[in-house]
Structure formats: C-alpha cells, structure tokens
C-alpha cells in the first residue's frame, strides 16, 4: 500500500522562524499517524511573480517563467494533503507566499485536505484577513481547507498544540479524499469555515480575546487585565446586538489594556 504524504510549505523569508515551527508542528502531528512528510521553504525556491502572459499554463500546469513554480505545483498534485503557513505583511500574505499562489497551476488537487496558518507578529493585526487569502487560494485550486489557524504572539504556545492536532486530522482525512462535486458545494463548504467571514472589527475582537485568555497577571498587570476584561465584555455585548461601530472603541480599549498587561508580564 502506498504511503500517504503531506507537504508543508513555509512562506516566511526566515527558513527556521516561527512560521516554520508552526508548520513543523502540524507535520509532526500528521507523521504521528504514519504519513510521510516533506517541507518546502519558499525562501529557497526563487519563485518570481506571474506576468499573466502564457494562458496555456492553466491547461498544462507549466509555468513558463519559473521551473520552481512548476515543480511545486507538481508536488501539490502528487501529495495527499498540504499545510501552508504564511506571515502577515500589511494585513495579508507576504510577497513570497503571493508569488507562490499566483504561479501555482495544479491538475490534481480537488478535495485534498489542506491546513492554513497565518502568523501575525507585533500587534497581531491581519491574522484573520491573511487566513482569508490563504483559504481563498485553497478554494481556487479546489483543496478542502480545514481548521483555519490564526496565530499571534499572544496565542502562539496554544497554537503549536492546535497545529499538531490539526496535523493529525489531516492525516486521517487524506485517507479518504473528498472531491467537490460542484462549485456550489465548494462555496457552501468554505462559507462555513471559521474566521473566513471576519471583518476588521471581528479580527480585533479576536485579538482582545487572545490577550485575555493568555495572560496570568499579578501586580500592576492584574488591574490592566481586569480593565481589558471589562472592555471586552462591553464590546462583545455590542457586537452581539449588531452594533459593531459602537463596539470598536471598547475593543481597542480592551486590546490596549491587554497589551500593556502582556508586556508587563513578559518583560
């Protein structure tokens, strides 16, 4: 019986950075159930931008500008599942990842399971908008995306555990590939995935939540955490009432108090 294989793609320019660690954790979870794994770092591939000048690439899967792009497309065709991790630049995927996406021309990916991970350093902003870009890519090449994973410095440790669990789930799912039968089925499936319908208000509320859930504060940080929790609760109630615009000030108050508490706790 052929061994199943899962491909990990690291979109960060840092070959051994935090994005790489998250992808490695997901592959480790998959490997624990038997599949083989392989990691590709986009920083080492030299994939250049698409010039949209060779329409035949859509039918034959060959990029005329980049052999590396063609080789990676064939890996996506050959492997049984994929993990794609990307850092956040300007609330979106970085250029390395975007060049990879734009030059991908797959011929055999319908229904293969895929896990996307976004990593937003610093403020954490862009963690769900970047996930949306990753899963839009999965949608376009007919992968069956699972478990969108938004990661910031505030939930990084927990995210490693989530990545491992999702990797195990990938290993199980790739045993029984489920191709989409129609475009309408694919749209309905992706519409139901968590985080993909988040707007900028939802995203910042999520960041405030990540802060609150991952701070164990004492001293000066404790009062700030309590303030963050109060403001978050007010924001959550307003969002639930459909008053997102009114909620924004409370979301940002919660976030600002939470980040101050975080910085005190971690320095």
Please give the residue ranges for each predicted region.
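Phosphate/oxyanion-binding loops and surfaces in catalytic or ligand/nucleic-acid-binding neighborhoods
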Residues: 107, 141, 173
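Short, glycine-/small-residue-rich phosphate/pyrophosphate-handling segment
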Residues: 110-162
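Short helix-terminating capping/connector loops at secondary-structure junctions
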Residues: 1, 109-110
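A mobile, often basic/glycine-rich helix-loop segment
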Residues: 102-106
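N-terminal beta1-alpha1-beta2 submodule of the flavodoxin-like/Rossmannoid cofactor-binding fold
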Residues: 1-101, 164, 170-171, 175, ...
